[in-house]
Amino acid sequence: MASVTSLTASVHQRLADALSAALPEAGSADPLLRRSDRADFQANGILALAKKAKANPRDLATQVVARVESGEVIKDIEVSGPGFLNITITDQAITRNLAARYEDGERLGVPLAEHPGTTVIDYAQPNVAKEMHVGHLRSAVIGDAVVQILEFTGENVVRRHHIGDWGTQFGMLIQYLIEHPHELDHKGAAEVSGEEAMSNLNRLYKAARTLFDSDEEFKTRARRRVVDLQAGEPETLAMWQKFVDESKIYFYSVFDKLDLEIRDPDVVGESGYNDMLDETCRLLEESGVAVRSDGALCVFFDDVKGPDGNPVPLIVKKSDGGYGYAATDLSAIRDRVFNLKANSLIYVVDARQSLHFKMVFETARRAGWLNDDVQAQQLAFGTVLGKDGKPFKTREGETIRLVDLLDEAIDRATAVVREKAEKVGLSEQEIEENGRYVGIGAVKYADLSTSAVRDYKFDLDQMVSLNGDTSVYLQYAYARIRSIFGKAGDRTPLAHPELELAPAERALGLHLDRFGETLDEVAAEYAPHKLAAYLYQLASLYTTFYDQCPVIKPAPAQEVAENRLFLCDLTARTLHQGMALLGIRTPERL
């Protein structure tokens, strides 16, 4: 495995060295290198440096140009405007760099982080005994993409799925199951489907709720059962575990449909921190971070006030002795920092919970659990909207079941795949498999191509379109490239650095070389949408290249054909790897 220095980094270093030579007092000055439509790069840093040194910017720019060691990388540098530098790269440097990436297998020359840390990512957090709905989609999809991207950079990533598996509602459910012990029995099937598991839970929940609302004696028994659950009474815990296990059958079936890997050891729900709650509260109170207010243990903040102007506290422990969500979240922070040794905590959680997490993180900082060496941040996401721009609901105003949404996406995508299947020669099995890949990819990409914090419209017509910024467009671009190699005969992909590149080849090559630096930015900002934008631009540049630069017909010269096949293959591999990091599959034939 050999990492490859990007052309951007090579040019940046040469300019920085020349700047230091021309203006020693500037130290290691930043040339502020940017992509440009006037050349391959433009450097804008000289203007500010000249102003600081009371020098003429054009004169300083001319001195810098004279000191640049161009080598085989820089073809031309010109001074433009008040002191900008326009830099053009040699064709040879572009092809050599791409050849080095090509030789590096799946990593494509992308270096591993020099100083990897440990990041805990909290994402995909459904609730036990409750159906997953469209609101659960974004945390799962965004979180999984961030996990894949960080792991690719070499970070040690610990996944956590903080499922809602505790609370007073379990008293009602457990009591009903004790009185109706066969409600969660499976009808002789060796393997229960997720749909059947959820059907069992739904039926039991509705029956328990009806009884709870109509029978005072049952309500009393259910409330006593909550006390038993919190005390760890064995029979009660055994019944509670049945709900958790049945729910996991359902959860895992939905995540499997979403093509997400969820591992059982990574599922640590609210109950996983029960043994820490008392100590968390004690530590907060003893340190003075939390104080008693009307019998409750609270943390106050100067900048958090209610409509009446009075402070709104974070309630860690209620006046009746019960623990709030904050106690669980703060205990989870302690576990992740001190037991898992995390440097970074990422919470992929709805933006509507931002105030809660702001207060939780500030409390943890005051307690000394978070500091400059251990950071926590919420990767907040917006709402999924319908075509009308309103929160996505059924016509009856109900929340949409996630599994129904995914099934519809797969059905629509399968119809799109089937339209072209005969031309490509796909079997029925391939049509169904590709339909799943395209449908689930469409749902994921629509989410991931939007900045997480923004709301986005769920429009299946647009999502499965072959035109525009969709995963289907990218998947078809990949499949189209793979099909070229079936027509290439005895010609193979081979880099030819000695060849002059056409404008479309240069544009594609420069973009391919930016894959690593794009991933650096994406990983640093937890911004999968920037990777999606890179891949869409890659597919668009490839389309232009394919239209303008014949690969097979009319047949170009041998060396030109080999070099273009090399660009095709590297584009396909970059698309494949980039889409995989977003959790999207790329079928070989579409």
From Swiss-Prot:
GO terms for molecular function: arginine-tRNA ligase activity; ATP binding. It comes from the Bacteria. SMART domains: Arg_tRNA_synt_N, DALR_1. It is an enzyme of class 6 (ligase). It catalyses: tRNA(Arg) + L-arginine + ATP = L-arginyl-tRNA(Arg) + AMP + diphosphate. It holds the Pfam family DALR_1. Belongs to the class-I aminoacyl-tRNA synthetase family. This is Arginine--tRNA ligase. It comes from Streptomyces avermitilis (strain ATCC 31267 / DSM 46492 / JCM 5070 / NBRC 14893 / NCIMB 12804 / NRRL 8165 / MA-4680). The lineage of its organism: Bacteria, Bacillati, Actinomycetota, Actinomycetes, Kitasatosporales. The gene is argS.
